[in-house]
């Protein structure tokens, strides 16, 4: 049986805004983001700048309206 993968949290899920630039969702991604070296900086739902903390083992980001997301929650191998 195939398990359904859970939806991404609102701050980094598919939304109206690009999580790296704050522009429209269909805008180009910065090179560092394409390589996976950049954490999301803007909420995908509302475009607000998020509070971001980078750690040696990942990052967390928090939108004042849509909550908290941690990179360890997004990695299915952990």
Swiss-Prot record:
One of its GO terms (biological process) is biotin biosynthetic process. The keyword Iron-sulfur applies. The keyword Iron-sulfur applies. One of its GO terms (molecular function) is metal ion binding. Keywords: Biotin biosynthesis, Iron, Iron-sulfur, Metal-binding. Its cofactor is iron-sulfur cluster. Probably contains an unusual Fe-S cluster. Disruption phenotype: The deletion mutant is unable to grow without extrabacterial biotin. The growth defect of the deletion mutant in biotin-free media can be complemented with biotin but not with another intermediate of the biotin synthesis pathway. Required for the activity of the biotin synthase BioB. Belongs to the BsaP family. This is Biotin synthase auxiliary protein. It comes from Mycolicibacterium smegmatis (strain ATCC 700084 / mc(2)155).
């Amino acid at each position: 049986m195939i398990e359904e993968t859970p939806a991404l949290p609102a701050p980094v899920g598919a939304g109206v805004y690009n999580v790296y630039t704050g522009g429209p969702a269909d805008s180009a991604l910065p090179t560092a983001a394409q390589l996976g070296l950049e954490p999301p900086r803007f909420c995908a739902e509302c475009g607000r700048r998020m509070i971001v903390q980078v750690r040696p083992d990942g990052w967390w980001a928090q939108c004042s309206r849509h909550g908290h997301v941690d990179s360890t929650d997004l990695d299915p191998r952990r």
